[in-house]
């Protein structure tokens, strides 16, 4: 029948895994990383780049690259790259094809079957687009699995004889998904789900970049239009600084000069407190989906047995603290 792989097709990063017995194992990509950036680019020679190489190109040639296209799945939005038009499912197919190649290199044989995760709130069109992306990539999609169900399984909430109500709080790079999952008699069922397709860690990064640029006299929107190389370099540094500020209290960002030269630029020091103040208005947008998901499941927060954190943005202390405040309990931390 052939090996079935599991794919997390994410907004900012994707991953591929398989079951070794009953234990899931991540398959490393060509650069020996666990995550493949969900970025597609076309270089000057017309070669399609995917993952880390595309992300590197995006820093210096943002006009030749695209990311966050998961937000457009199921729509008719087209993206022009290298003079060609691509639908969202075609862009996703490039990422899936790259993950498929990594799996084939690992197993040393063809891989044609996959299970792909999607947000629980994805509608029928978005799910069909995901299946279509798999087909374009040469994969038979055996099943579309809701991300909160996959997360609950990963945290071990599937024991026979246990009955629990689990809230899965998934704040990734580009999307926010909150779901109530009921565990009963060894099965898992999503009782309710809500979220935002345009809310995630990328929004925190761009907000940080805007404040850093403003601090040196460059309004963000004007800089995006006139100095795209400067903006892309600052965004790249802000992404790294955001991760650093989850562990440390300060981070330094260097704003390049108009030519993109970092050495000739200015240094800006950002504190964790500043970052948290900047992103708090954005983080407030999680509250309405949380209220809605509890109301749809006809539950109060006191009826939630466990809270599970999923997605890279939940590594930020400000996010963990807000979840703790919302539910009055310590959430399960992010799994590697």
Range-by-range predicted roles:
Residues 1-75, 79-85, 104-336:
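Oxyanion-binding/catalytic loops of NTP- or PPi-dependent enzymes
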């Amino acid at each position: 029948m052939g090996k079935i792989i599991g794919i997390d097709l994410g907004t900012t990063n994707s991953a591929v895994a398989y079951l070794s017995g009953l234990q899931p194992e991540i398959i490393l990509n060509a650069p020996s990383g666990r995550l493949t950036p969900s970025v597609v680019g076309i270089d000057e020679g017309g070669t399609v780049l995917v993952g880390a190489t595309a992300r590197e190109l995006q820093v210096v040639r943002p006009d030749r690259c695209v990311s966050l296209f998961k937000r457009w799945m199921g729509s008719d939005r087209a993206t022009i790259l290298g003079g060609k038009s691509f639908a969202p499912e075609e862009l996703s197919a490039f990422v899936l094809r790259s993950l498929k190649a990594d799996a084939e290199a690992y197993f040393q044989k063809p891989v044609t079957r996959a299970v792909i995760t999607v947000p629980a709130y994805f509608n029928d069109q978005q799910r069909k687009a995901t299946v279509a992306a798999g087909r374009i990539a040469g994969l038979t999609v055996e099943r579309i699995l809701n991300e909160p169900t996959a997360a609950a399984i990963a945290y071990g909430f599937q024991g026979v004889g246990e009955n629990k109500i689990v809230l899965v709080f998934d704040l990734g790079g580009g999307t926010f998904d909150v779901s109530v999952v009921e565990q009963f008699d060894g099965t898992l069922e999503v009782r309710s789900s809500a979220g935002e397709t345009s809310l995630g860690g990328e929004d925190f990064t761009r907000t940080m970049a805007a404040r850093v640029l403003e601090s040196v006299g460059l309004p963000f929107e004007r800089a995006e239009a006139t100095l795209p190389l400067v903006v892309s370099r600052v965004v790249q540094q802000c992404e790294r600084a955001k991760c650093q500020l989850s562990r440390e209290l300060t981070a330094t960002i260097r704003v390049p000069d108009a030519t993109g030269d970092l050495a000739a630029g200015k240094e800006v020091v950002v504190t964790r407190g500043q970052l948290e103040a900047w992103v708090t208005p954005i983080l407030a947008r999680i509250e309405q989906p949380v209220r809605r998901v509890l109301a749809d499941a006809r539950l109060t927060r006191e009826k939630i047995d466990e809270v599970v954190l999923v997605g890279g943005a939940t590594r930020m202390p400000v996010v963990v603290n807000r979840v703790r405040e919302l539910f009055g309990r310590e959430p399960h931390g992010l799994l590697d």
